[in-house]
Amino acid sequence: MSYYVAHRLFAAHDRALAAQLAHHLARKLGEDHVFLPFCDTDEENLVADVKGRRLFELDRDRLRRIRALIAIVHGPSPDDGVCMEIGYAAARGVPVILLTTDFQDYSTAPDGPRTDFPDPLLDALATRTVRLPRLSATTEPSGTSRFADFARRNQAQARQAIDACVDATLQLPAPAADTPAPSPSSNTVYTEPSPYVPPHHPLSVLTRNPHVTTISQTRFEAPDPLTAARRDWTAALASARILVDASGPETPPGAALLIGAACAIGRPAAAYLSRSSYTHAAGREPNCRNLMIQYGVDAILRSTEEVTTWIGR
């Protein structure tokens, strides 16, 4: 069993940070026990008939046999592929460690309760959060420039965060058996709206079906968002199907987490996505969403009619 390092992987600086984390984990655990996406799937050089789907399959197959997942998560728009992987691991009962150097807290109201991440469901699913939000202490000037000195402080902060994350990983308890998936409630659909669209968006209207019991998220309006997030998670995993609104610059964190959960426990899931911007990478088919999202769902619904049909089937 291996330790899976989940990270945003489109830019060199993100890959470099994840590689440093994987390197320091491997020094303690052995290289064969650490898996780093992009690196260990040889993503840049991989050749396949449908490359994006093949990359999804390689990552999903590794997620099925991991000891723990360590995810780098930061900023107001967490990577949707990383969130999918977190949801997958959490639904199987695999420990999840979240590493962040973000200096911001988040809330749904100016004076509301604060969380470490923009979606309280991330806080709720973390076995442990390793957070180092401040720059390292000022050191002696390098004598080169203030920019070089600032870079050194940021690099030291990242190193300290990695060291703390490795320590947290080594302190995890012995692995337990996989968490069995709850028995689904027949004719129940859990719906996850997008926080990036108005409340009157079609998803909330179209899910009203007299023959189907629909349940939706409660955490963004709750006085105790963490407790509500845990209830949302339990309700989603106990539903017969999961429908998410994937609208936004990326798939919203909650939607991505639930797609991962559905994929892990074999629950049918669909994503409503009325508009797409496509990504293109060498040797890869055009993708309407992150690979872990596009191939992690059973259906992508493009119209209100398709949503209505999927809900009522």
What are the residue ranges of the model-derived segments?
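Conserved catalytic or regulatory cores that recognize and/or transform ribose-phosphate-containing ligands
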Residues: 1-313
